[in-house]
Regions:
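N-terminal "leader" segments that precede or initiate the main folded domain
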Residues: 1-114, 195, 218-257, 399-436, ...
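Membrane-interfacial loop-to-transmembrane alpha-helix junctions, especially the N-terminal start
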Residues: 23-36, 189-195, 372-386
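Hydrophobic alpha-helical segments
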Residues: 337-343, 347-437
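Hydrophobic alpha-helical transmembrane segments
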Residues: 3-10, 14-22, 45-49, 107-119, 163-177, 180-185, 201-209, 335, ...
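Membrane-embedded catalytic interface detector for glycan/lipid assembly enzymes
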Residues: 84-233, 248-263, 327
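Small-residue-enriched transmembrane helix-hairpin modules in multi-pass membrane proteins
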Residues: 137-162, 251-366
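Hydrophobic, membrane-inserted alpha-helices
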Residues: 10-13, 175-178, 197-203, 221-225, ...
Length: 470
């Protein structure tokens, strides 16, 4: 089955040489292609050739990814042809300026609200899984982090964790990033110290529930932001972000959450294996199990998606598919095993629907890549919003339509829109200031009225005060 990966990989290489290398892998289209290749490779490694259902699943996934790449490539060529045929000047992907957003009262108010919401949530729950795990490790009595984590999200008491996550995992760290960039570029010592403290609070909030997915996604968002801030170039110093920040936090969480308990591996190796499993194994195992589970069920015609979207509403548990699949794998409902993106599409709209949606995704993500970041200037708030949208859509490997919403798509879109409104206001003020400086100065009302004085204007396109003569 692994040979099925090679033609898709070859098509992806062609797509990279023609299109992706122009705008970079850290774009909605580029990141989606990379993640889907990882998903396909990891899945094909697990497929049992003797199972017709699993073989069909592998073929279905390979065909869907190939259709996506083909549609994306055709869309890219169409956009380039349209630009070449038009009289408009060609726009490059890196011809823009970046301005920094300062800590306005509105931004600071949203930061405070995010901190209050996060603190109120953990106060209501009564504990932080991360802090309890750290306390247990220090005391020599490791806590049952899996149970604590599950109780905080799906216990008897419901404290709207999905809504809290929008503040805790998206808005707070994103605004902290904006303020850190401003303080180290324009601010003084006090501003830098305050931004570092805010960053520490944001990182603790990301890790507090004992789930590292949000941390990994935001570190990737920081990488995309750095790439865009430097006009689609990734400085070598930016590569230190995963090493200097990501690796220590992954090691700490591995130690605190006791993921390597009973293992003779070093914490570094355990963290690396855990990260490898997250991208190459875990989602693939879950997706394969979900497809085996749903293959004998009738097509839902979008019903399971509607259940999942209804789960966004307060108090609604949403779709139970992931919990049902988890039960078939582990004999317990105290966890979730979501289907893959393509498995979810097939379960909801069958094979023909999957073909259409795969092609549609290729068109939409390519247009998102092409039609954004083409203005003359952007600000840091816009960039962090677009970076988050890029990561949320680009890493969409598992789950249905509710998955991007749960991991912050709407919140990042809101930050993007907020930043664009800020830029529009700045451009309006800039044009108004320019118009005022070009307006002729009025003649003084007292000119020629004071006895013994006369006003002698000079001949120029702008009236100026002349010389006073007795």
């Amino acid at each position: 089955m692994i040979l099925l990966f090679l033609p898709v990989l070859g098509l992806a290489v062609v797509h990279y040489l023609v299109a992706i290398r122009r705008y970079g892998i850290l774009s909605p289209d580029g990141l989606f292609v990379v993640c889907q290749l990882l998903m396909l490779y990891g899945t094909l490694r697990l497929i049992n050739p003797a199972s017709d259902t699993e073989v069909f699943y592998g073929q279905l996934m390979a065909a869907a990814i190939a259709l996506y790449i083909g549609a994306s490539l055709v869309t890219y060529l169409w956009v380039k042809h349209s630009e070449a045929a038009s009289a408009k000047p060609r726009v490059t992907y890196s011809a823009y300026r970046v301005s920094l957003v300062r800590p306005t009262p509105t931004i600071l108010a949203v930061v405070v609200i995010s901190i209050v919401v996060t603190a109120a949530y953990f106060t209501a729950v009564g504990y932080s899984a991360f802090i309890e795990g750290l306390r247990g490790q220090l005391n020599g009595l490791p806590a049952d982090i899996a149970t604590l984590r599950l109780e905080s999200y799906a216990g008897n008491a419901y404290f709207f964790p999905g809504y809290v996550n929008q503040f805790k995992n998206v808005i707070l760290p994103s605004l902290a990033l904006v303020l850190v960039v401003w303080s180290f570029s324009r601010g003084g010592l006090l501003a830098r110290v305050a931004s570092i403290a805010l960053s520490a609070v944001a990182l603790l909030a990301l890790m507090a529930t004992g789930q590292r997915g949000a941390l990994v996604l935001f570190l990737l968002t920081v990488m995309v932001y750095t790439f865009l801030h430097n006009r689609r170039r990734l400085p070598r110093a930016a590569l230190l972000v995963p090493v200097v920040i990501g690796l220590p936090l992954m090691l700490l969480s591995t130690y605190v959450l006791a993921r390597s308990a009973g293992s003779t591996e070093s914490p570094i190796r355990a963290a690396m294996n855990d990260l490898f499993a997250r991208f190459i194994n875990d989602n693939q195992v879950s997706g394969l199990a979900a497809f085996n589970y749903t293959s004998g069920s009738p097509v839902r015609n979008g019903g399971e998606w509607l259940d999942g979207l209804a789960g966004v509403l307060p108090g609604n548990r949403g779709s139970t598919l992931s919990a049902e699949v988890f039960y078939t794998m582990y004999g317990s409902t105290r966890g979730t095993s979501p289907p893959s993106l393509w498995g979810s599409i097939h379960y909801n709209v069958d094979t023909m629907g999957l073909i259409l949606i795969a092609a549609l995704l290729g068109v939409l993500l390519q247009l998102l890549t092409q039609r954004t970041m083409r203005a003359a200037s952007y600000n840091s708030l816009e960039l962090v919003g677009f970076s988050g949208v890029t990561v949320v859509l680009g890493t969409w490997m598992a789950g249905g339509l509710e998955t991007p919403l749960n991991v912050g798509l709407v919140a990042y879109l809101g930050l993007w829109y907020w930043g664009s409104r800020t830029s529009s206001g700045q451009r309006h003020l800039s044009r108004r200031s320019t118009a005022l400086t070009r307006r002729p100065l009025p003649r003084p009302a007292f000119a020629g009225m004071v006895t013994g004085l006369a006003y002698a204007p000079r001949h120029s396109s702008r009236l100026r005060y002349g010389t006073w003569r007795p």
